[in-house]
C-alpha cells in the first residue's frame, strides 16, 4: 500500500499564502494525491501446481487553478476564476493456476479483469459588477470529459523444453473489451441564463482472440535464434480484422564477453492512445479501432552490441528504426466542430517514424548497484488532414534522455535508492496569433476570451527540459514466523523541479497578452508498506 501526503502537508502553507495574497486580489488552489494498493497471494498446492491472486488499485487526483478578484469598496466588484480537476486510475484483478506436467513442460492459465477511467473537468467563470445592476455581466463555462475501458481476459501459456537447445512457448489469449471512447458534458451560463449539453456516451464492445508460438533455439555455441508468430483476430461493429505478427531475432556470440544482436518485429495494435497537442497530461484518451479506423501497424528493426566486463559490469549500444501506419491524432481545429460530430470524425489517420540509439552501462553486483542509460531519439508524424499534410515532430519527440539509477544496500535491513531523470522537453502546439471577434467591446477587467487562434504548425514549441530526482529508503523488518515487512519512504522530485506541461496565453486588465508555462507536480513524499507471507 502506498499513499502520497503532499495534499495534507501543503494545505497549511497554501492557506497562509492565500491569506497573504488576498490583499492583492489573488487566490491559488493546488492539490495532488495518489493511492496505490498491491496485493498478491500465492498458494503452493503441491510439487506440481500452485495458484495465485493479484489485485491492484491505483487512483490519482490533481486539482489546480487560480482566481483574481477586486479588493476594496472603491472599485466595481469583479472576479475571474480558472480551475481544473483531473482524476484517473486503474483497477486490475487476476487469478492464475500453474501446473508442471513433467520435467519438459509446464503451463499457466490466467483469468483477468481490468478497468481504466480518466475524468477531466475545466471550469472558468467571470463576473463584473453587482447582480441586479444594469452593467452587471457574468459568464460561466464548465466542461467535463470522460474516457474509459474495461477488459475481461483469459490467457493460457505453455512452455515446452524438448532439448537443452530449444525452449518453445505457445498459447492463446482472449479479451473482451468494453469501451467508453468519449463523453462530454458542457454547462454554460451567460448573464445568469444557463444551458447544458452532452455528447458522446457511446459504448462499444469488441472481441479479441490470438494464438501465438515462439522458439528460442541455440543453433550452435555462437548463434542463437528466437522466432515467433502471433495470429490476431479482432471483431468490433460487425467488422473483423485479421493480422499476422512475425518477429525474429538473431544473436551472435563473437567472444565469451562480446555479442551482436539483430531483430525484426511486426505488430498490429487495436487500441489507440490519443493525446491533446497543447499539453502533456496522464489523462490521454484510449480509443478503439472501428469500421472507419484501422489498427495501428508497425515494423521495427534493431541492431545492438553487448559487452560484459568480468561479472560486475555490462555495456550495450543499440540502434532502432520504427515505421508506423494508421496512427491516429486529433484533426486541426477539432474542438470547433459541432457538438453532434462523433469521436471518429474528430480523428485523422496518418503515419509515423521513430528512430535513434540507446547506450546503457550497468553494475550488477556488490552492495552498490545501478545503471546509466542515454538515448538519442527522433519521432515524426505525417497526416493528410493535419499541418497541411506536412511532416512534423511528434509530441514525445524527446531528443535526449538520460537516466541514472543507484541502489545502496547498507545491510540486510536497510537500503537506499536514488534515480535522476533528464530529457529534452515534450512538444506542444501554441498559437502566437489571435483574431478577435469584430465588434466585441470588453468591459474591464473582463477580457475577450473569444476570437480565433491561428496555429502555424502542429507541435511548434518545445517545452523546457524535464528533470527530477527521486530518493527512497527501504526498511526490511523480518518477522518471527518467517514473514517479511518492508517500509518504503520515498520522495518524488526531491529538489522540487517544476517541470512545465504546457504553455498558455494570459491576459491582463490593460489588454496586454503574455505566455506562461504551467507546472503541476512539485516534491511529493510518500510512504508504502509491503507484507510478504
Residue ranges of predicted features:
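Gram-negative outer-membrane beta-barrel transporters
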Residues: 321-323, 341-432
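Structural signature of Gram-negative outer-membrane beta-barrels, strongest in the C-terminal barrel
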Residues: 149-151, 161-167, 173, 200-324, ...
Amino acid at each position: 500500500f502506498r499513499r502520497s501526503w503532499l495534499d495534507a502537508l501543503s494545505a497549511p502553507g497554501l492557506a497562509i499564502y492565500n491569506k497573504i495574497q488576498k490583499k492583492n486580489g489573488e487566490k491559488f488552489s493546488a492539490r495532488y494525491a495518489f493511492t496505490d494498493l498491491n496485493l498478491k497471494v500465492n498458494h503452493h498446492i503441491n510439487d506440481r501446481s500452485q495458484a495465485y491472486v493479484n489485485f491492484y488499485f491505483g487512483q490519482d487526483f490533481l486539482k489546480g487553478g487560480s482566481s483574481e478578484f477586486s479588493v476594496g469598496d472603491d472599485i466595481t466588484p469583479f472576479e475571474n476564476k480558472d480551475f481544473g480537476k483531473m482524476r484517473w486510475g486503474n483497477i486490475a484483478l487476476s487469478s492464475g493456476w500453474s501446473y508442471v506436467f513433467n520435467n519438459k513442460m509446464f503451463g499457466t492459465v490466467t483469468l483477468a479483469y481490468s478497468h481504466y477511467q480518466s475524468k477531466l473537468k475545466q471550469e472558468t467563470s467571470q463576473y463584473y459588477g453587482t447582480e441586479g445592476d444594469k452593467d452587471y455581466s457574468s459568464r460561466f463555462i464548465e466542461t467535463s470529459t470522460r474516457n474509459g475501458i474495461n477488459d475481461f481476459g483469459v490467457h493460457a501459456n505453455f512452455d515446452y523444453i524438448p532439448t537443452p537447445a530449444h525452449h518453445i512457448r505457445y498459447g492463446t489469449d482472449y479479451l473482451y473489451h468494453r469501451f467508453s471512447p468519449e463523453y462530454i458534458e458542457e454547462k454554460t451560463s451567460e448573464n445568469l441564463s444557463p444551458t447544458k449539453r452532452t455528447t458522446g456516451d457511446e459504448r462499444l464492445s469488441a472481441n479479441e482472440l490470438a494464438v501465438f508460438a515462439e522458439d528460442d533455439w541455440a543453433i550452435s555455441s555462437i548463434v542463437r535464434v528466437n522466432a515467433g508468430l502471433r495470429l490476431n483476430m479482432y471483431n468490433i461493429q460487425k467488422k473483423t480484422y485479421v493480422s499476422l505478427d512475425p518477429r525474429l531475432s538473431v544473436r551472435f556470440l563473437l567472444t565469451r564477453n562480446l555479442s551482436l544482436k539483430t531483430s525484426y518485429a511486426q505488430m498490429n495494435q487495436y487500441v489507440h492512445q490519443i493525446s491533446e497537442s497543447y499539453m502533456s497530461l496522464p489523462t490521454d484518451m484510449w480509443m478503439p479501432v472501428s469500421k472507419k479506423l484501422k489498427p495501428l501497424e508497425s515494423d521495427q528493426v534493431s541492431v545492438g552490441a553487448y559487452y560484459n566486463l568480468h561479472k560486475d559490469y555490462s555495456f550495450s549500444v543499440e540502434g532502432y528504426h520504427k515505421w508506423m501506419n494508421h496512427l491516429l491524432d486529433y484533426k486541426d481545429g477539432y474542438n470547433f466542430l459541432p457538438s453532434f460530430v462523433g469521436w471518429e470524425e474528430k480523428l485523422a489517420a496518418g503515419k509515423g517514424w521513430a528512430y535513434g540509439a540507446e547506450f546503457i552501462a550497468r553494475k550488477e553486483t556488490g552492495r552498490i548497484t545501478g545503471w546509466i542509460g542515454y538515448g538519442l531519439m527522433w519521432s515524426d508524424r505525417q497526416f493528410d488532414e493535419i499541418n497541411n499534410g506536412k511532416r512534423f515532430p511528434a509530441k514525445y519527440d524527446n531528443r535526449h534522455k538520460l537516466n541514472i539509477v543507484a541502489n545502496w544496500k547498507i545491510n540486510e535491513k536497510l537500503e537506499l535508492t536514488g534515480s535522476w531523470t533528464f530529457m529534452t522537453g515534450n512538444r506542444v502546439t501554441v498559437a502566437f496569433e489571435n483574431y478577435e471577434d469584430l465588434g466585441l467591446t470588453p468591459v474591464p477587467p473582463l477580457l475577450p476570451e473569444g476570437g480565433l487562434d491561428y496555429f502555424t504548425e502542429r507541435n511548434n514549441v518545445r517545452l523546457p527540459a524535464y528533470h527530477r530526482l527521486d530518493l527512497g529508503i527501504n526498511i526490511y523488518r523480518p518477522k518471527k514466523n518467517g514473514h517479511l515487512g518492508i517500509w518504503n519512504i520515498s520522495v518524488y522530485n526531491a529538489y522540487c523541479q517544476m517541470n512545465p506541461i504546457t504553455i498558455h496565453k494570459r491576459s491582463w486588465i490593460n489588454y496586454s497578452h503574455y505566455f506562461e508555462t504551467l507546472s503541476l507536480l512539485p516534491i511529493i513524499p510518500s510512504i508504502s508498506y509491503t507484507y510478504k507471507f
